[in-house]
Curated annotation (Swiss-Prot):
This is Scolopendra 5971.33 Da toxin. Expressed by the venom gland. GO terms for cellular component: extracellular region. It is found in: Secreted. GO terms for molecular function: toxin activity. Belongs to the scolopendra toxin 6 family. The keyword S-adenosyl-L-methionine does not apply. The lineage of its organism: Eukaryota, Metazoa, Ecdysozoa, Arthropoda, Myriapoda. Keywords: Neurotoxin, Secreted, Toxin.
Amino acid sequence: EITVEPVRHPKKDPSEAE
């Protein structure tokens, strides 16, 4: 299930991805 995971590190934003 999706909660806040996609919001914390959106795939559309590589800058947020560690």
